[in-house]
């Protein structure tokens, strides 16, 4: 179910114990698949696969209850019940679901947005979206030696990393107007009692360091983001984080990694 988008060098942004359901802890991955308690994403995939198989309600597992290839036509509430009219995208058969509760997870970015590239019909190699990266043979094919990745978000950084680890020659393309490089790079290391950066970020104090509508509007958040002293303090904090990240990455001194210095962010 979840395997198609995974690949060998795909790592999580979360750590052991933070991405599991309370009724089924996730087994700890082997140490070779861990880095400051971040781990290869394939272990989350396996965990979710197992979870859908072992949880059963009224004689049906979660896997039995998941329906793929279904398009929702309408949602109505009649006599206190939800009525969901759907069609199967493969054979156009209609089906109506009835439920006492409805959760909408619209997945606004679940449909791949493929750019139109001039002359792509004359290009001899495969052109794929990140969605198909894991199920493709791009990383394992000996005939594919050069890979170009378009875009600067996390998924692009993941693909660049995976391609380099697979021994490919990689070109990373950004828009001319994008002067800051990849979306976000951060050292995984923790400080004090925290083993990694994720654990620090999950604390209530650290969560207030980034402006968010999710945070409550308190004197503390107004001080940090609404006063000149707070803005100066936050600027100093993030400058320190940026400096430490650059030091850990050592972009400019890895002589055996050609082009690694070009990954250095161009933060103003």
Set out the residue ranges of the language-model regions:
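Glycine-rich dinucleotide-binding loop and its adjacent helix/turn
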Residues: 44-47, 104-170
